[in-house]
Amino acid sequence: MMVLLHAVYSIVFVDVIIIKVQRYINDILTLDIFYLFKMIPLLFILFYFANGIEWHKFETSEEIISTYLLDDVLYTGVNGAVYTFSNNKLNKTGLANTNYITTSIKVEDADKDTLVCGTNNGNPKCWKIDGSDDPKHRGRGYAPYQNSKVTIISHNGCVLSDINISKEGIKRWRRFDGPCGYDLYTADNVIPKDGLRGAFVDKDGTYDKVYILFTDTIGSKRIVKIPYIAQMCLNDEGGPSSLSSHRWSTFLKVELECDIDGRSYRQIIHSRTIKTDNDTILYVFFDSPHYVPIL
């Protein structure tokens, strides 16, 4: 695995989604969300095509809650609905009100459904993409109780997330659904309260490894930010004792360093992986106390 660092000098802090062209598929460009800020109501989505720029306006002002790209379909979660963009068409599926759609995920079960999950007025719930109920998947773990940033991934039918499964629970990284084994979670206070800044699965030899990225904050008078990447085996079987049987036994973290021209970048803002023929390249977007981003 390789981390590429490249300075970014022209970042403008505005309430928009910046979407970068990734590749051509079925006459539509697959889109890679380069950076996403917390946004006020957004009126349109901007897409880049081979023949120029095209604008797709929402019918009403919407606050963007989440965005996911699954099988060349862009899912955009808002309050009470999810928008899908595919084959140059923008569609809307209405769901319950006071329901912030934080998650769109491909569940690799027998039905291979795409689920959309939301807060559902403090009672997390999942639906199929057509808006019908999904009785097979609980909402807990798939969506938070209140609108907040989440990290959730699915690999070979196994679902992992940093979403609390109880209202007052401690933030943890969990494997909680699928054929990889029983539920596992990190120890107390390993995951920061604001959650992760990326997660992905990559093969290391014959084993599938899970990687997560986050920034830890230590100190009370003098605050210090420490960026980490951690790994664990996807098929981890837990610890040997009754107290550790549901803890990750292969969890290992290492500090990331990003020092350029004498300046240290210590806070992870966003991360993204790009797979090549021979490797997986990890891009990490760092920030510094001076608010000068770096990639």
Curated annotation (Swiss-Prot):
Listed Gene3D superfamilies: YVTN repeat-like/Quinoprotein amine dehydrogenase (2.130.10.10)
SMART domains per the UniProt record, alphabetical: Sema
Gene Ontology cellular-component annotations: plasma membrane
UniProt protein name: Semaphorin-like protein A39
Family in the record: Belongs to the semaphorin family.
Superkingdom to which the source organism belongs: Viruses
GO biological process assignments: integrin-mediated signaling pathway; positive regulation of cell migration; regulation of inflammatory response; semaphorin-plexin signaling pathway
SUPFAM superfamilies to which the protein is assigned, alphabetical: Sema domain (SSF101912)
Record InterPro entries: Semap_dom, Semap_dom_sf, Semaphorin, WD40/YVTN_repeat-like_dom_sf
Miscellaneous section: In the Western Reserve strain (WR), the A39R protein is intracellular and not secreted as observed in other vaccinia strains such as Copenhagen strain (COP). The WR equivalent of the semaphorin-like protein is split into two ORFs which are likely to be truncated and non-functional. This ORF would be the N-terminal part.
Any one GO molecular-function label of the UniProt entry: semaphorin receptor binding
All copies of domain Sema, residue ranges: 1-295
